[in-house]
Amino acid sequence: MYWVYITEDSEAGITIGFSAEMDKTFLKLSARGTPLFYLRSFSIPFDALAHKHLLEDLSLKTIKRFIRTYQAETKRCRDRLLINYDEKQTF
């Protein structure tokens, strides 16, 4: 899977990222205490990168609307990452 995510912190502001290894990226973000506000998965890397570039071209107001609109999907994806992490830790 390929992932597009959005984080926000007081120093860097909003960051729109892409990851092919979201479990590792999620751990790094968690270790730094960086909240994950938006997370969406894609099966094709081109689609993920196109979505990332679309988000980068949008206004901050529209990005915040995306974050609100996809809150439930972001939570499901985040929970799935946590479950996968827990399963890996038990082996």
Predicted segments with their positions:
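GIY-YIG-like beta-to-alpha core
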Residues: 2-32, 41, 53-57
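Sequence-level detector for tyrosine residue identity
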Residues: 2-5, 38, 70, 85
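Intrinsic-disorder/low-complexity regions
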Residues: 8, 22, 46, 78, ...
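A generic signature of intrinsically disordered, low-complexity regions enriched in glycine/proline
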Residues: 13, 27, 51, 61, ...
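Aromatic/basic micro-patches that form nucleic-acid/chromatin recognition or nuclease catalytic surfaces
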Residues: 30-75
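A cross-kingdom feature marking charged/low-complexity
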Residues: 70-91
